[in-house]
Amino acid sequence: MNCINNLLVISALALPLMVNAQKATVGLSADGGKLNYKVSYNGKTPVPASPLGMKVDNICLGTDIASFSKNPGAETSYTVKRKDGAVYYVDVREFDDGVALRYRIPADGPKCIYSEQTAVTFPEGTRVWYASGPFQYGWIQAYQDRDISKIDNELLAPPATFLLPDGTYAAVTEANLRNFHGAVLFGNNDNSVNFGYVENKGHVESGTITGMPGSHVHDVVRDYPWIAYPDEKTGEIVTPWRVIMLASDLDGLVNNTIIGKVADAPDPELFPNGKDTEWIKPGRSVFTWLTEGNNRLSVANHKRYVDGAAELGLQSVVVDDGWELWPQTEPEGSAHTKWEYLKDLTDYAAQRGVDIWVWRPSSVRAGNKTDIGLVDAGERRQFMKKCAETGVKGLKIDFFHTENLFTVNLMEEILKEAARNKLMVIFHGVNKPTGDNFTYPNLLAKEAVRGLECVGGENSWAPGPAWTYHNTVLPFTRWLAGPADYTPL
């Protein structure tokens, strides 16, 4: 059975159901036994009839629908009942600047999630700005723009931004990604993009990442469970929100607020004051990674960077990969532990009003016997407790390169433990933001962007656009998802 042709059905009737909103409305209909939705905005239809659906336990949920009903309440939710008695829900949220939809499947034993058929269709002549590449690195590729009809089975890293023929702007992404695998977009060669999942199986072989140069062997994470979909889940299944941002101009687009509105609120035990937590202090930083050759990681050189940051009025210095080897690389060698060297640096920086952040990989890299990583819960607790005691203010955690279920949950555990120790976090080598910085205000940024770290050396594999084009596109594409760990020079 072709799942794409058997989409989630709410009604056997082709009768549209409208949800009221000030500017954006979602209309649901079941035309020909298939669930469709459309979006109206400012008297226009930027998203004409588009399919919804999921494939769970190898069954397209849209078949054999017995009934559906709209549930009472402030938020719109539809209950869908199958003839076999199975029940699931479609939730709809509407805002002045767009819409969001998601699926909920009640707990009923283990379930395997195979695929998703949620699509967003645009009028003919729509142009799209997007980044595309191997899925581990799709978030740091160069942006390009094309007519949407020319994109056929090509991966688009969310968010992708669209300019419709009538001048309306739209952006498509996902939000509130928690305990679920992340999604990408695929072009369908038919004026639409489809939410979908990328299989992890087969992307790790002989210490290399498929499609990537051998110089990136060290980026392969060996103790991640690199699994292929379907993902098996127990308990209630709640998908992330599928978000469509809408605006009549670019100013409205960059000021879109949907992601923050659908993100879960912070845990009051971890963040009693929410986003106003006193120890969370965003700022500008310097780091030595690109410019200092073999001397870049020494304690003395970092003190020089602290002096420079203080002189320039910058808030922090990031101590990158290699600091944990200081007992082997510093002139005094093993006379001091890595923590003693680090304490010397944090004390020096504190006297000058500069914070110190430290780097660590999320897990053990292939062929690197010095890595420890943060997968083990005990190691996470010990490492972060020691960082806090040493005076470190923030962590740069690197090398995720996937958004499977394990990795998404690992990032959340890292953020929780960091919050317990009053540590700020940036994620590097990671997927796009989905509102996680609203749920965890100590997450200041995620990379998921092609910065000037990719200009040469070991990063020269990333093909480069004209930087003037790339930088002017970013505020209207990648930055719509959330703050970025971006490297300018």
Predicted regions and their residues:
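Generic recognition of flexible, low-complexity loop/linker segments
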Residues: Y89, Y229-E232, G274, Y305, ...
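An acidic-aromatic substrate-binding cleft motif
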Residues: T234-L312, S316
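Long, contiguous hydrophobic alpha-helical segments, chiefly transmembrane helices and signal peptides
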Residues: F95, V99-L101, V120-F122, W241-L246, ...
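Aromatic- and carboxylate-enriched substrate-binding clefts and catalytic-loop regions
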Residues: V319-L489
